[in-house]
Curated annotation (Swiss-Prot):
This is Transcriptional adapter 1. Keywords: Nucleus, Transcription, Transcription regulation. GO terms for biological process: regulation of transcription by RNA polymerase II. The keyword Nucleus applies. It comes from the Eukaryota. InterPro entries: Hfi1/Tada1. Residues 79-106 are annotated as: Disordered. It is found in: Nucleus. GO terms for cellular component: nucleus; SAGA complex. Residues 95-104 have a biased composition (Basic residues). GO terms for molecular function: transcription coactivator activity. Belongs to the TADA1 family. Probably involved in transcriptional regulation.
Amino acid sequence: MAAHASELEIAKKNLTDAIGENVKHYWANLKLWFKQKISKEEFDLEARRLLAQDNVHVHNDFLLAILTRCQIIVSTSEGPGSLQWSGGSASKPGKPSRGKKKFPSVRQKFDHRFQPQNPLAGVPVFSPREAEEEELKLSAQTLLLPSRGQLEARMMVSAFESDLDSVAEDAVSCMLCALQVHLKDILTALVSRRKAYRLRDGHFLYAFGSDVTPRPYLKNSLPAYHSATECPPASASLPAAAPARVCPDEAEQNAALLLACSADTAAPPLQPVSVYDLLEALQVQRRVMPSHSMYALNMERILARLWHPSHEELEQDHIHRQHLALRDGLVT
């Protein structure tokens, strides 16, 4: 791993020395390529404009070093460690190996009965055009979290823009953990606006969608609800410890009392989560996204998703689909 990191630093230094003062333009083009705003051909063309004819190989060496390091990190983090055979002798140490008598082989030779065959005859033909046509999709398109290699490549681009040499593995792990916690907070804020929940210790949310709400006009409703949701405070003389587990009979009794003291009308079924719910959750709970720049950018994206076509546009789209269907019918 250290060897690949040193190779990346050497390739970055050679590239910086070859480009000179225009290295910021190169980092900007690299960032645009990672965001898929420009193609690989356009990125190579811009890199050739910044480099001399003799230094074009430096650009290729730098890209190869980045891809190699990302691939090595993904393979080491995801693949379990396998036991490797050392290739040594199976004899016990300290005991000299006894010589075994070699008997002459009695296997008949059937080499003359077989014809030589090319082992590469059954290998499928690789088409480079198919690989070029397969575009790399972003996380917004695949609706999946970025892999460790993708996140490290993106962090390395940001590090190069800030005049940093490399990115540590601990920083990538910390970023992955922060991303998961951030998404968990957004989902918690979204679900808490739609479903009832309970609080433990005044801040921990749990039991989403239990649909057990206290009846405000019933005397035993609030004590039963708070006894099931709050934990007793720790004593000053005793250290704080985990709360004792409730026996099944007592838990069943508390649940029956809470259900008897709750409202008798069931909540109507909710519609699936939409962009309107996300907009309301972010507007009400601003603490989920404390950065103002990120909050403004995401609010703009959400408001842009709320656009819907008018009746005229729907009618024109229907006419266009009819023309396409008619043309396909005539062609076939």
